[in-house]
């Protein structure tokens, strides 16, 4: 399936949203009861992206971080994270990104991640590889303990199982990064800046764009039991658990095999 037109729309929308995020001040408000935040920039960025996608593909379904799902059920679905790393931006930490994924029959076929801070844009089409600054990555094996990133779903901070799993992963790592911006972590992994990424009940909206780019850049995504992770957007949250790393590195990160 030729998705070059959809990819072009996603790239242009993500970069336009990045310009907005980089130049405009943010008004911050609480989001839910778990200490999460939202800003007016989340909403404005999302409105910009959704309007562009809707103008180009009025019949497609769009699932966006702030506004949820809109449009008729169908095989063509867009996932929009207008500001991944809101809490970071709110405290002045320049670690955030924009992510857009286009999916057909529940599988991501095109993905874009834009970093407003560096101005870098990364993209991928399923089966055609990934493009962007630092790609393809030159990754050489290292004997040092792996540098890993961790991501978890919302509302799990007080969950004992989550804490135990995170502690176990950290014990196997040289350093465990919790960036609160999974899209940034996916790009770091795709570029070989980190050795792996572990996700537990990962959030859906920011998942497909980053995972597709990393996979097309040569990253292997495993289930906790070591089997290949089926990169689909219709999996329940309880099954969005993964270990992403380069070939042959799974046992270093997850030596128990599950």
Question: What residue spans do the PLM features occupy?
Answer:
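Oxyanion/phosphate-interacting regions
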Residues: 1-8, 12, 160, 164-170, ...
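N-terminal subdomain of lithium-sensitive/metallo-dependent phosphomonoesterases centered on the IMPase/IPPase/PAP
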Residues: 1-83, 255
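Residue-level detector of anion-binding/catalytic polar loops
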Residues: 59-61, 175, 195, 220
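DPxDG-like acidic metal-binding loop motif
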Residues: 72-131
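Short, Asp-centered acidic motifs that coordinate Mg2+ and/or phosphate
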Residues: 110, 147, 195-196
């Amino acid at each position: 399936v030729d998705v070059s037109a959809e990819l072009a729309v996603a790239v242009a929308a993500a970069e336009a949203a990045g310009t907005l995020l980089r130049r405009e001040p943010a008004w911050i408000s609480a989001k839910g009861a778990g200490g999460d935040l939202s800003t007016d920039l989340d909403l404005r960025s999302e409105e910009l992206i959704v309007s562009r996608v809707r103008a180009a593909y009025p019949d497609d379904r769009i699932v966006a971080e702030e506004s949820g799902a809109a449009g008729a059920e169908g095989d063509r679905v867009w996932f929009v994270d207008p500001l991944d790393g809101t809490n970071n931006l709110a405290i002045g930490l320049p670690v955030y990104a924009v992510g857009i994924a286009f999916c057909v029959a529940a599988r991501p076929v095109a993905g874009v991640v834009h970093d407003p801070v560096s101005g870098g844009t990364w993209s991928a089409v399923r089966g055609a590889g990934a493009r962007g600054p630092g790609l393809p990555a030159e990754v050489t094996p290292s004997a040092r303990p792996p540098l890993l990133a961790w991501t978890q779903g919302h509302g799990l901070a007080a969950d004992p199982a989550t804490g135990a799993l995170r502690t176990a992963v950290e014990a196997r790592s040289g350093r465990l990064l919790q960036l609160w911006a999974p899209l940034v972590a996916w790009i770091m992994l795709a570029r070989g800046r980190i050795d792996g990424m572990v996700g537990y009940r990962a959030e859906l909206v920011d998942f497909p764009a980053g995972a597709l780019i990393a996979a097309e850049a040569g990253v292997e995504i495993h289930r906790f039991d070591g089997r290949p992770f089926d990169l689909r957007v219709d999996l329940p949250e309880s099954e969005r658990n993964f270990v992403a790393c380069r070939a042959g590195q799974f046992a270093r990160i997850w030596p128990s095999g599950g």
